[in-house]
Amino acid sequence: MKNNLLFTEHKLGPITLRNRAIRSAAFENMAYGNKPSQDLYNYHTAVARGGAAMTTVAYCSVTRSGVSFDGQLYIHDEIKEDLKKLTDGIHAEGAKA
């Protein structure tokens, strides 16, 4: 494929993406106990390793009462390190998170 834009680097505001392939957010149902699991980590790092420029973790709640489903992330102080591990893993594979 001559000059296929999908595989070219792209600037998105201040962020430079290695290509234009982005995995959009979808409900993975892998946040067991409403926190990032090893399955969630493995899934998103595999997407990044596969060549996606960016992967978006599924929607999450900012309050306990906002949790709609089991397996949905709930942002609170106790999971900051888990989220950092997930983000660092995605970045280590060359993708944005």
Residue ranges and their predicted role:
Residues 1-97:
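Flavin-dependent oxidoreductase catalytic cores
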